[in-house]
Amino acid sequence: MLSIFGCVRAVPRVVQMSARRTLKVPAPSQSIPDVEAFLKTIGRDCSELTETFENKWENLFEWDSKTLKSKGVSVQQRRYILHQAQKFRNGEPVKEMKKGKKSFFGGERNRKATVAKWRAEQRNK
């Protein structure tokens, strides 16, 4: 691979990221005093993971996605828990966000074709 200076490099340079920034661990609130209450408040069956976090408040806010993956937490739950933990850290209210539901006719891209097929089937009945 040729660089702009005309030198040939066999391996591209890897840019090192700076050291991880330390994230603050917020104090528990009156409505959410422990890990179990937090996971129950955010819903989506996250309360089943109380043992995974060893019921330690620090683990909930210090563990990253890699750590949760090694503990066997699914991708969707990892992302959801980390998002809700960040909201709590920022002082925003924590509440359950329901999962979205797909339309009967599918996604937006194929909707016209799907609706046309459905209407044709209804006419033929």
Curated annotation (Swiss-Prot):
Q: Where in the cell is it found?
A: Mitochondrion
Instruction: Give the CC-aspect GO terms.
Output: mitochondrion; ribonucleoprotein complex; ribosome
Here the transit peptide covers 1-10
Q: May I ask which residue range the UniProt record assigns to the signal sequence?
A: none
Record SMART domains = IGR
Key words of the record: Mitochondrion, Ribonucleoprotein, Ribosomal protein, Transit peptide
InterPro entries assigned to the protein according to its UniProt record, in alphabetical order? Ribosomal_mS41 (IPR039603), SAM_Ribosomal_mS41 (IPR019083)
Q: Where do the segments described as Disordered lie?
A: 103-125
Query: Would the keyword Protein biosynthesis turn up in this protein's UniProt record?
Result: no
Question: Entry's Pfam families?
Answer: SAM_Ribosomal_mS41 (PF09597)
Similarity-based family: Belongs to the mitochondrion-specific ribosomal protein mS41 family.
Role description:
Involved in telomere length regulation.
- Xref: PANTHER family: PROTEIN FYV4, MITOCHONDRIAL, SMALL RIBOSOMAL SUBUNIT PROTEIN MS41
Return the protein name: Small ribosomal subunit protein mS41
